[in-house]
Regions:
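GHKL-family ATPase ATP-binding module
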Residues: 1-11, 19, 43, 51-53, ...
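NAD(P)H-binding Rossmann-fold N-terminus in SDR/SDR-like oxidoreductases
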Residues: 79
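Residue-level signature of the cytosolic catalytic core of signaling kinases
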Residues: 11, 34, 86-90, 226
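Short conserved segment of the HATPase_c
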Residues: 82-104
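Short, flexible helix-adjacent loops and helix caps
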Residues: 27, 34, 54, 82-85, ...
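Conserved short strand/loop->alpha-helix "switch" segment adjacent to the catalytic nucleotide/phosphoryl-transfer site
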Residues: 24-43
C-alpha cells in the first residue's frame, strides 16, 4: 500500500466519523426521522440550487420523483467545483461537499453573498442519511460523475465521463433515502409542490419543475415561474378575497449588499395577521427585526399621509397599527449575507440592522407610493378609520358591560 493510499484512507475515516454522527442522531440535523425529516433531505438539495439562483447563475431547477423511490434534483447553475480541495488534498471539492459537515460555498467562502438552507448543515447530511447518492456535474466543458453508498461511503470517485452536452453547466443529485433511518421513504407530491411554489414566488423568474414518475403515483407534473415575484405571491394569497383595489403595491431598497422588497394589497376582510416575512427565502414564522421595521414604519407613514391629506383631523387620535393592518396582505422578503436566526428552526430574524433598513425603505418608498396612488391611499385610510371606530366601539361596549355587571353584583 502506498503512502498516498494510506493518507487517503485515514482522511476518509475521519470524514465518515462526521457522517456517522448524523446517522446516530439524525433528529439533531433534520428535525425528525418522520415525514418532516424525509422532506428536509429534498429541501437541503434544492436550497443549494436556489443559492445558485440567488447568486444569479441558475434559472431552472427540476425535481423528479423517480420510479424506484429516489429523488433527483437538477439545476443549470455553475456546477459544484471539481478541483482538489485546499484543506483535504486527497479529495476534490465536490467530494468534500458531499462528505464533510458544513462544507460548501455558503460557509464562510466567497461562493455566495446570500444563502438559505433551513439548518445550513449542507448536502453531506443527505448523503449520510441515504443508502445511495449519485452526483453528476457539468462544469468547464466536461461532465463528471461520482456516487456514494451506505450513508456516505465513497463508492466511485469523481471522474470525468465525457463532454458536457451542448456546453451545459449545472449539478444533478439523485438520492435514495435510507429505509433503516426513516419511518417511511415515500415523498409527498403536495408537500413538495407547495414549497416549490413558494420558492418560485420568492425568486422572481426562477423556473421550478416537479414531476412524479412513480408507478404508484398520479404522474403529476407542475411548473412554477413568476416574473412578478412577491407581487404575484400577494395576488395569489388574495385571490380568494375581495381586494380593496386592483393593483399590488411594491417597494424595494438595497443598502451595502442587503436587500428588502415588500409587496402589499389590502382586501375587504377584517384579519390583521396577513403579514408574511422571509429572510433569504426562509419563512420567518415568528417574525423578527424585518417585520418590526415594517410595522412601525407602516403605522407612521399612513398616519402622516392621512393628516397631510386631511383624511383624519390633526387633533384626532392616531390610527393604531392594528387598524391599518386590518385586511392587509403583505410579503416582506429580505436578503442578507449573515442572517442571525433565533432558534435552530430559523423562525425569527435577529439582525438589528435589518430593522433599520426595512424601516427606512418603508418610510421613504411607501410614502412615495401613497402620493402616487391617491385613490388607493384614500381607500386604505378609510378602511383603517372604520377599523378604528369598530375597535373603540367594542372597547366601550366591554367597559359598559363590566360596569353593569359590577352594579348588578
Amino acid at each position: 500500500m502506498t503512502t498516498a493510499e494510506t493518507s487517503y484512507s485515514e482522511a476518509d475515516i475521519t470524514v465518515l466519523e462526521g457522517l456517522e454522527a448524523v446517522r446516530k442522531r439524525p433528529g439533531m440535523y433534520i428535525g425528525s426521522t418522520g415525514p418532516t425529516g424525509l422532506h428536509h433531505l429534498v429541501w437541503e438539495v434544492v436550497d443549494n440550487s436556489v443559492d445558485e439562483a440567488m447568486a444569479g447563475y441558475c434559472t431552472t431547477i427540476e425535481v423528479i420523483l423517480c420510479e424506484d423511490g429516489s429523488c433527483q434534483v437538477s439545476d443549470d447553475g455553475r456546477g459544484i467545483p471539481v478541483g482538489v480541495h485546499h484543506q483535504y488534498e486527497e479529495l476534490t471539492a465536490a467530494e468534500v461537499v458531499l462528505t464533510v459537515l458544513h462544507a460548501g460555498g455558503k460557509f464562510g467562502g466567497e461562493g455566495y453573498k446570500v444563502s438559505g438552507g433551513l439548518h445550513g448543515v449542507g448536502i453531506s447530511v443527505v448523503n449520510a442519511l441515504s443508502s445511495r447518492v449519485e452526483v453528476e456535474i457539468d462544469r468547464d466543458g466536461s461532465r463528471y460523475y461520482m456516487d456514494f453508498v451506505d450513508g456516505g461511503r465513497l463508492n466511485t470517485r469523481l471522474a470525468t465521463s465525457g463532454a458536457s452536452p451542448d456546453g451545459r453547466t449545472g449539478t444533478t443529485v439523485r438520492f435514495w433515502p435510507d429505509g433503516s433511518i426513516f419511518d417511511e421513504t415515500r415523498f409527498r407530491f403536495q408537500t413538495l409542490s407547495e414549497r416549490f411554489q413558494m420558492m418560485a414566488f420568492l425568486n422572481r423568474g426562477l423556473q421550478i419543475r416537479l414531476r412524479d414518475e412513480r408507478s404508484d403515483g398520479n404522474h403529476d407534473e407542475v411548473e412554477y415561474q413568476y416574473e412578478g415575484g412577491i407581487r404575484d405571491f400577494v395576488a395569489h394569497v388574495n385571490s380568494s378575497k375581495e381586494s380593496l383595489f386592483a393593483q399590488v403595491g411594491y417597494i424595494e431598497g438595497i443598502e451595502e449588499g442587503q436587500e428588502v422588497e415588500v409587496a402589499f394589497q389590502w382586501n375587504t376582510g377584517f384579519n390583521a395577521d396577513g403579514l408574511h416575512s422571509f429572510a433569504n427565502g426562509i419563512n420567518t414564522l415568528e417574525g423578527g427585526m424585518h417585520e418590526e421595521g415594517f410595522r412601525s414604519a407602516l403605522t407612521a407613514v399612513v398616519n402622516r399621509y392621512a393628516k397631510k391629506r386631511n383624511l383624519i383631523k390633526d387633533n384626532d387620535e392616531n390610527l393604531q397599527g392594528e387598524d391599518i393592518r386590518e385586511g392587509l396582505t403583505a410579503i416582506i422578503s429580505v436578503r442578507l449575507s449573515e442572517p442571525q436566526f433565533e432558534g435552530q428552526t430559523k423562525s425569527k430574524l435577529g439582525n438589528v440592522e435589518m430593522r433599520s433598513l426595512v424601516q427606512r425603505t418603508t418610510n421613504e418608498r411607501l410614502a412615495d407610493w401613497l402620493e402616487e396612488h391617491p385613490q388607493e391611499a384614500k381607500a386604505i385610510v378609510q378602511k383603517a378609520v372604520n377599523a378604528q371606530r369598530a375597535r373603540v366601539a367594542a372597547q366601550d361596549a366591554r367597559r359598559s358591560a363590566r360596569r353593569k355587571s359590577a352594579l348588578d353584583g
